[in-house]
Amino acid sequence: MRLGLIGIGLCGAALAGCATMEVPQRVALAEHIATEHRFSRADIQTEHFRLAAFIGPREKAGVLHVYIEGDGFAWATRYKPSRDPTPREPVALDLAVLDSRNAAYLARPCQYVMASEVECPVRYWTSDRFAPEVIDSMNEAVTLLKGKTGADRLVLVGYSGGGAVAALVAARRTDVIQLVTVAGNLDHRAWTRLHQASELTGSLNPPDSWRALVGIPQTHFIGQDDTVVPVEVYRSYRKVFPESADIRAEILPNVDHRCCWADMWPTLLMQLR
């Protein structure tokens, strides 16, 4: 039997590990991580959403690394969406603050902004998480971050569902010199099939943009023990590209969807162009 739009992810996979953390606490955690590493908050108003961002302290440089957050706390239980998708563990922010180069962090719509239900209906962290207006807004924010930091080229780094966003944004741009994903959900159709979940009917899917992505060098880091976004999702994405495409995947032993990307990130960063 086909399941509903289940909460696949941190809480969907391990409900016992989801200790209560209210939204103000989640916001405070991210701000503490950012402040500790001298990242400054710079929220961005786009046509459709107000997006939370943090900009690193490095000197302005030609290349900006933009880290895009995952789906966050999208589900309260396996079948019930949360009231606010602000992450309980901001993995992409943990990675961004470890980057010694010019870096910025960009949250997803409705994360960290305490938005109303009118501004942020639940569909934007469930079925429509990769909707055209979401990608439009993220792309607009990336352009503004690029201007704020004086960059002329971009490396987009997406964690989990942020990997899909990074790919879809990269497909719309000509200034992305590398696409990087960490435990990235690069094919949500394959992902929902694997988990026997309802499709993300309002969302764009990265493989459909392969022609725009084929010329961009790509590196995808995958946890061998990741049961949330297993390697099969990457393989489904990769097969739409020609063999000659500059796409590299590294499958890391003893790593799952969450653990232990921050510990490994300084070493993995050295592999990037």
Where are these regions (language model features)?
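Alpha/beta-hydrolase active-site loop
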Residues: 119-148
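C-terminal catalytic histidine-bearing segment of alpha/beta-hydrolase fold enzymes
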Residues: 239-273
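Gly/Ala-rich beta-loop-alpha elbow adjacent to hydrolase catalytic centers
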Residues: 157-162, 166
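N-terminal cap/lid segment of alpha/beta-hydrolase-fold proteins
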Residues: 27-58
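Short, surface-exposed "cap/lid" segments of acyl-processing enzymes
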Residues: 47-50, 56-107, 111-114
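The feature captures the conserved acid-bearing segment of alpha/beta-hydrolase catalytic domains
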Residues: 184-185, 189-244, 248-253
